[in-house]
């Protein structure tokens, strides 16, 4: 019994092997026939046609096949066509064979496919390799031209563009007069045609003369038809023809009626679905409105993303001369195309509305696999985090080789664990309106880039940590957690800070110290003339100490700190140890659960310097996270050794000056309001200016300050702040204004200070410090400041005038000296703010609008130009203007009929084709426009996008 089974099994295998040999023999016999060149067939079929591979799985849509029949016969089937209940709307099949064909009379291309239904994707059959099969491939080098009347005349010739002739035809011998050669080309049917290629005329051009008229007559070509020349992978020169779509003037020669053809298509598919047998279909790519044999992978990818009403999409269409263009639109409905015959069918179940109208017909209903959505491509606008956003001026991402933009919104520090949190401001000039705009833009930001982490935030971190506001009675709830330090320590702190900075010279310094001391002893008293006793005692204690004077030097990273509180985690010490005296403020603590720390700092000489504050009359002391490295200021001679000392008697005052004036608009000031956290550990990145020549420090710092300001402020804010009409005194309290007037009246000769504050050292740890100020939560008011941390800027009223007695004359200098900063939107200002929106204690004059910048237009070999894209209403006007600028009239206005292309770089560094995006979005995100010649277009398609980047860098 077993032997008989083995014999039967062996016989089956022998028969299967014989059958396979016979199939291969048949394939070789079929292969003996001339096979149509796949590249030429695809060139004639169109750039969007892609046939499935043999043996692959596809979905066959009978509904789409019926559309092809209707398009071929130009007749819609009537209601007498029967329904086939057992025929599903889509049929999973395996491709057994594909054969390429071309009509001998018209050269119309079509494909014959043999399909076999399968139950699932696992039910596939092994397909033997037949010699007649060739893989589908598109040509890489081709030229297509729509024939004109002169091209089809019997006595004329065929004009070939110079670039196409030089690329496809053999090189001419220009030593001949005139240069000419004989071309031998083959068509779809392997027929040979001979043309004479000559270079003549005025101006000279490439022409096909002898033999061309014979070809036009034999093919019955008319104006509007297209001719294609390609060079295949074997370097053979091939010739194809495309017929223009014309109205049918005569009845079809087919003996079958339109209804019979529809019935035949549906009946064959229904029989195959029920029996599982193979069936044959014919696909005409030039006639069929849409392909109806879809690869399973393409179908699954499209249906994985569930479509929804309002979804944005794009779809590729073939335009003139075998070019492609992407059109965008919106899904406006989802419903069955033919609910009676094909319920629940995915064929054309999307109702769409196109952004542009005209320039060819586009269907009102499409299938999900025919479109590109934001989820499966990065070219189109998306509603996700990677969406195209309104580009806020000054926050663009740099394009390689183009000096456009210098900062990124992702560099703004945010709360730890909440990188997408909203930004919070510290009260300063224009901060409320700036934050409103930045929050609107920041809501769609992606994850911050590590290499864009701002180093400015590290500097602000150290600057802000120097400042501890005095606590009022309303903050007594938080003072229970704080430790009190002896008053002797406070005096020692005051002494060490003054020893560090040197003695103060001149009688005019004494009233300043008096006013500062008084403001610290009595928060309710604003009179700086009642503190002589305290100042004298402080000065005498300073002189009684025997520690040496002078500045201490430290490395750029500083030395570790010793803390008083176990909770404090101190940062590195700066090069200057400043006095942490503070101006009395009327402040109240909002929801403060953190303990404000004040640490001890041990300098390189071993002397322990305590940074504390003289707080309220009750003597409450607070702890400080770090201290401030003071800026370079004008110096005077100390009476003991002629050493250069700072002009400011109190560096805490200068910290306020930094907070209130020059640093008030830095990116690090915008903090996260969702999570209140204490400042974390930070590495000091200050270096002592004693090691660097003063001139170098001043130049470096002025450049650094200008770059900081240019990074964080839009144009309208900068022009508002830097306006000559906006005087610094308007931001001071009435006491300060009176003090300034008094100083000018007395003729006090006050030394001027440099706007350069610190020597910035880009340490490795600076990138991680930008989120350390997330504990700040301040709200700007006119006379009070609410704070939950150890920072307080001078932005509005509610501060003492004594701290400004040593500042330069504010009327003689502006708050900010900003260079003109161009917006990154290249032609439009995305910042829609007005100076009149600022709520200030003055009547601000209406400001003139910011100077509009222009978009660069570049072309290889030509001088770049600038253009205002907002001055145009649509793409056509823009193309016409650019064409006139570079003498390319007629080459840019119609992208479908020209080999010249216009591309642009947006602020996300994406290179897109001009015309893909809606006009309003284009003018807001364009950074640079580039004109690509046909050779550059071809080179880019071969070598990738780095070719365009190289061109941009070279320009």
From Swiss-Prot:
This protein's GO CC annotations: nucleus
Transmembrane stretches, start-end: none
Free-text tissue specificity from the UniProt record: Expressed in roots, culms, leaves and young panicles.
InterPro entries found in the cross-reference section: ARF_dom, ARF_plant, AUX/IAA_dom, B3_DNA-bd, DNA-bd_pseudobarrel_sf, PB1-like
Compartments in which it is found: Nucleus
Gene3D superfamilies xrefs: 2.30.30.1040, DNA-binding pseudobarrel domain, Phosphatidylinositol 3-kinase Catalytic Subunit, Chain A, domain 1
Listed Basic residues bias regions: 551-560
Keyword Isomerase attached: no
GO biological process, one term: flower development
Domain annotation PB1: ranges: 852-936
Keyword entries, A-Z: Auxin signaling pathway, DNA-binding, Nucleus, Transcription, Transcription regulation
Polar residues composition bias: residue spans: 518-543
SMART domains linked to this entry: B3
Pfam families: ARF_AD (PF06507), AUX_IAA (PF02309), B3 (PF02362)
Molecular function, one GO term: transcription cis-regulatory region binding
Location of region: Disordered: 518-573, 609-646
Segments of the chain annotated as binding DNA: 143-245
Recorded domain comment: Interactions between auxin response factors (ARFs) and Aux/IAA proteins occur through their C-terminal dimerization domains III and IV.
Similarity remark: Belongs to the ARF family.
Function: Auxin response factors (ARFs) are transcriptional factors that bind specifically to the DNA sequence 5'-TGTCTC-3' found in the auxin-responsive promoter elements (AuxREs).
Oligomer status and interactors: Homodimers and heterodimers.
Identification of the protein by name: Auxin response factor 11
């Amino acid at each position: 019994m077993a032997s008989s089974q083995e014999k039967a099994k062996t016989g089956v295998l022998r028969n299967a092997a014989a059958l396979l040999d016979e199939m291969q023999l048949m394939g070789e016999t079929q292969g003996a026939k001339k096979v149509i060149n796949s590249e030429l067939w695809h060139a004639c079929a169109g750039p969007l046609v892609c046939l499935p591979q043999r043996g692959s799985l596809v979905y066959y849509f009978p509904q789409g096949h019926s559309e092809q029949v209707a398009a071929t016969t130009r007749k819609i089937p009537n209601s007498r066509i029967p329904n086939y209940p057992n025929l599903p709307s889509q049929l999973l099949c395996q491709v057994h064979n594909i054969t390429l064909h071309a009509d001998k009379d018209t050269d119309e291309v079509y494909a014959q496919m043999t399909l076999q239904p399968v139950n699932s994707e696992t039910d596939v059959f092994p397909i033997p390799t037949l010699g007649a099969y060739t893989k589908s491939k598109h040509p890489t080098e081709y030229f297509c031209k729509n024939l004109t009347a002169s091209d089809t005349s019997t006595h004329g010739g065929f004009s070939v563009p110079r670039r196409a002739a030089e690329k496809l035809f053999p090189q001419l011998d220009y030593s001949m007069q005139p240069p000419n050669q004989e071309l031998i080309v083959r068509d779809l049917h392997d027929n040979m045609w001979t043309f004479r290629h000559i270079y003549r005329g005025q101006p000279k051009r490439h022409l096909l003369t002898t033999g061309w008229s014979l070809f036009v007559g034999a093919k019955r070509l008319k104006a509007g038809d297209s001719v294609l020349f390609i060079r295949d992978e074997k370097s053979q020169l091939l010739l194809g023809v495309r017929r223009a779509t014309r109205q049918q003037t005569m009845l079809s020669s087919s003996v079958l009626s339109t209804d019979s053809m529809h019935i035949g298509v549906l009946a064959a598919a229904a029989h195959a679905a029920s029996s599982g047998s193979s069936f044959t279909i014919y696909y005409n790519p030039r006639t069929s409105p849409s392909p109806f044999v879809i690869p399973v992978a393409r179908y699954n990818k499209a249906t994985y993303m569930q479509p929804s009403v309002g979804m944005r999409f794009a779809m590729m269409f073939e335009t003139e001369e075998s070019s492609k263009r992407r059109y965008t639109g919106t899904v406006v409905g989802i419903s069955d195309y033919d609910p009676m015959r094909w319920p629940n069918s995915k064929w054309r179940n999307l109702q769409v509305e196109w952004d542009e109208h005209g320039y060819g017909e586009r269907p009102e209903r499409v299938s999900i696999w025919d479109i590109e959505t934001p989820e499966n491509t990065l070219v189109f606008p998306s509603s996700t985090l990677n969406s195209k956003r309104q580009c806020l001026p000054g926050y663009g991402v740099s394009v390689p080789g183009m000096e456009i933009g210098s900062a990124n919104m992702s560099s703004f520090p945010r709360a730890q664990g909440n990188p997408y949190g909203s930004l919070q401001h510290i009260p300063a000039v224009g901060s409320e309106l700036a934050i409103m705009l930045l929050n609107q833009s920041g809501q769609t930001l992606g994850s911050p880039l590590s290499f864009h982490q701002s180093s400015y935030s590290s500097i602000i971190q150290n600057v802000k940590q120097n400042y501890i506001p005095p606590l009022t009675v309303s903050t007594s709830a938080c003072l229970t957690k704080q430790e009190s330090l002896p008053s002797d320590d406070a005096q020692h702190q005051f002494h060490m800070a003054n020893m560090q900075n040197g003695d103060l010279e001149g009688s005019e310094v004494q009233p300043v110290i008096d006013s500062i001391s008084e403001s610290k002893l009595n928060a309710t008293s604003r009179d700086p003339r009642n503190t002589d006793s305290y100042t004298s005692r402080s000065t005498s204690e300073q002189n009684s100490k025997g520690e040496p004077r002078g500045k201490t030097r430290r490395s750029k990273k500083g030395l570790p700190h010793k803390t008083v509180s176990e909770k404090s985690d101190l940062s590195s010490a700066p090069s200057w140890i400043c006095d942490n005296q503070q101006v009395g403020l009327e402040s109240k603590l909002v929801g403060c659960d953190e303990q404000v720390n004040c640490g001890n700092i041990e300098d390189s000489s071993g002397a322990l310097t305590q940074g504390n504050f003289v707080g309220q009359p009750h003597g409450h002391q607070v702890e400080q996270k770090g201290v401030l490295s003071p800026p370079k200021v004008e110096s005077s001679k100390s009476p003991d050794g002629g050493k250069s000392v700072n002009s400011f008697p109190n560096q805490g005052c200068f910290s306020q000056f930094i907070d209130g004036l020059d640093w008030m608009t830095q990116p690090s000031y915008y903090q996260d309001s969702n999570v209140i956290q204490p400042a974390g550990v930070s590495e000091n990145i200050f270096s002592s200016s004693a090691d660097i020549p003063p001139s170098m420090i001043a130049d470096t710092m002025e450049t650094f300050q200008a770059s900081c300001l240019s990074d964080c402020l839009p144009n309208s804010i900068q022009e508002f702040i830097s306006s000559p009409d906006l005087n610094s005194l308007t931001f001071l309290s009435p006491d300060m204004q009176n003090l300034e007037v008094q100083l000018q009246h007395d003729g006090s000769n006050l030394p001027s200070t440099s706007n350069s504050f610190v020597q910035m050292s880009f340490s490795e740890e600076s990138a991680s410090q930008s989120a350390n100020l997330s504990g700040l939560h301040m709200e700007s008011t006119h006379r009070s400041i609410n704070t939950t941390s150890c920072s307080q800027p001078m932005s509005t009223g509610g501060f003492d005038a004594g701290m400004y007695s040593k500042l330069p004359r504010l009327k003689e200098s502006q708050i900010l000296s900003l260079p003109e900063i161009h917006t990154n939107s290249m032609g439009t200002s995305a910042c829609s703010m007005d100076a009149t929106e600022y709520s200030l204690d003055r009547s601000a004059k209406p400001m003139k609008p910011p100077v509009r910048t222009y978009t660069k237009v570049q072309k290889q070999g030509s001088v770049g130009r600038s253009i205002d894209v907002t001055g145009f209403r649509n793409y056509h006007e823009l193309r016409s203007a650019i064409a006139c600028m570079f003498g390319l009239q007629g080459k840019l206005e119609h992208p479908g009929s020209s080999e010249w292309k216009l591309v642009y770089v947006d602020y996300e560094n994406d290179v897109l084709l001009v015309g893909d995006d809606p006009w309003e979005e284009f003018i807001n995100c364009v950074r640079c426009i580039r004109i690509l010649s046909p050779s550059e277009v071809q080179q880019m398609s071969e070598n990738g996008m780095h070719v365009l980047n190289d061109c941009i860098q070279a320009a």
